[in-house]
Amino acid sequence: MTNASTESFFNRSLADVDPDIFGAIGKELGRQRHEIELIASENIVSRAVLEAQGSIMTNKYAEGYPGKRYYGGCQFVDIAEELAIERAKKLFGVNFANVQPNSGSQMNQAVFLALLQPGDTFMGLDLNSGGHLTHGSPVNMSGKWFNVVSYGVREGDNLLDMDEVARKAEETKPKLIIAGGTAYSRIWDWKRFREIADSVGAYLMVDMAHIAGLVAGGVHPSPFPHCHVATTTTHKSLRGPRGGVILTNDEDLAKKFNSAVFPGLQGGPLMHIIAAKAVAFGEALQPEFKDYAAQVVKNAKALAETLISGGLDVVSGGTDNHLMLVDLRKKNATGKRAEAALGRAYVTCNKNGIPFDPEKPFVTSGVRLGAPAGTTRGFKEAEFREIGNLIVEVLDGLKVANSDEGNAAVEAAVRGKVVSLTDRFPMYGYMG
């Protein structure tokens, strides 16, 4: 490369180099600014997190762990990883943290690699009751490599059937029990899970990917000291970059998890993401994060109450955390149809199966809604009640139309109201 081409390589903007990608990013920024984000697993990160994630630390390979790398020149990325580790430990009150997992699936796979052998038995929440693919779904590696015993919720009240958990544990003697899920809106009884695990000599793993921000903020009970290991993603309610963390108080287990992550499952860690994790953990350690977590729960409750008042059923009758499953059958709608109609009205959510759902997984009888992203924008209970009424308006219009095309007039009217609402809560103003 000539000096001119080298200078161009280091200094040309994205808009100049790749206008197609620049344009897509600009359109996505517009979508995020003007639409209401209710996907429970999504959130909005700070400028500081974005800057760390987009930093030159992406250039550095750093196989191994701080102070024990297989590459030279790691003295500064070591600072970032050490800060991420120490902040994660402080945030959750634990002795050990591995901040290298690239995703939620990989953090869970690392725990399996450390604690299980192929063919071993473990228990997890059934996908149809609000579990995750990595908790034993037959289409996932976890369901293919291990003998999975699923537990679920009761058909009457849609609450966890802890008697079933105890009975199945006694019958099958699992090596590992997973507590936690992606669509369960009530408080988890970690103590009871640990008692059941101890009764059969099993490890207790808590996947708190969805509720970690609420745990850090003090509005949901911590799984420690009850669990042997907890995993969490760093986005969702924690408001960090996409990635995972493994937490434990057991030094021997910590060594196993470290070996499972590297070299067992991953190679070089993503140092720019780890730097961004450190920033997000630092933000979550600030006093205002507790206010944020408390507001998330208040907002979710306000939304659930509004939807119930509007004639919808919320699975289990309400929520204690950041999310809810909405049963659409009273509005004669499917999750697929409702997701599309709400999307056209600039309200973003995801179709989701409900417990004992008669519909197919790609159709579903419900949608999952969450409050973290809207709360980050500054929405409070009044805004979430307004959002709930807008959702009911769209679904009532959809019921009248009774077609996949929806009710264009109603959706257009709601879309205008959504833009008026989101315009009052701007985001990323520095981006222009």
UniProtKB/Swiss-Prot annotation:
Keywords, ordered alphabetically: Amino-acid biosynthesis, Cytoplasm, One-carbon metabolism, Pyridoxal phosphate, Transferase
Enzyme Commission code: 2.1.2.1
Cross-referenced InterPro entries: PyrdxlP-dep_Trfase (IPR015424), PyrdxlP-dep_Trfase_major (IPR015421), PyrdxlP-dep_Trfase_small (IPR015422), Ser_HO-MeTrfase (IPR001085), Ser_HO-MeTrfase-like (IPR049943), Ser_HO-MeTrfase_PLP_BS (IPR019798), SHMT-like_dom (IPR039429)
Cellular component GO terms, alphabetical: cytosol
Catalytic class of the enzyme: transferase
The UniProt record lists the keyword Cytoplasm: yes
GO molecular function: glycine hydroxymethyltransferase activity; pyridoxal phosphate binding
PROSITE patterns per UniProt: SHMT
Residues of the site described as Plays an important role in substrate specificity: H235
Catalysed transformations (reactions): (6R)-5,10-methylene-5,6,7,8-tetrahydrofolate + glycine + H2O = (6S)-5,6,7,8-tetrahydrofolate + L-serine
Transmembrane stretches, start-end: none
Residues recorded with modification N6-(pyridoxal phosphate)lysine: K236
GO biological process, one term: tetrahydrofolate interconversion
A UniProt-annotated Pfam family: SHMT
PANTHER family per record: SERINE HYDROXYMETHYLTRANSFERASE (PTHR11680), SERINE HYDROXYMETHYLTRANSFERASE 1 (PTHR11680:SF35)
Family that this chain belongs to: Belongs to the SHMT family.
The name this protein goes by in its record: Serine hydroxymethyltransferase
Organism lineage: Bacteria, Pseudomonadati, Pseudomonadota, Alphaproteobacteria, Hyphomicrobiales
Name of the gene this protein is made from: glyA
